[in-house]
């Protein structure tokens, strides 16, 4: 028997040829889902200083913090159906850092993100993708660059991509709590960059 998750993915694949979802301005009661890992949880900052909490204050909308520390793209994909059941009107996908740290096959990360976008579209919800740095030993020295798979997937899937945000923040020692996590100021700056990006899309 086909599972609910597989049905959502299949529906999204069939819809993928319809092109990028049209973005509309979120109503006052609409929620945003922030899907991710420890960067979404806000690891390294006090409670309430995570980027979803700061984003909620900036845009006056409810933001569901769908982050779990240590999550890989496969684990985030497995959690996504339950998060979509909360009926968000926009999903921000910021995932993949733990895949890179664990040196998981890039092909698996790509496929998991494809499935996430397909599942989100099957729920008739627009998605935006956030580029994640390719964490290597260079990150310990403050040399941070984005993994190229995000730009490639954004082009392939026709999904808006926020570039440069995490790489800029995690490349600045004043905005980090450790080599791969932001501090309060870093999460605030990410939220500000995301707000600017969403405004350009006409979402907020």
Where are the model-predicted features located?
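N-terminal secretory signal peptides
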Residues: 1-2
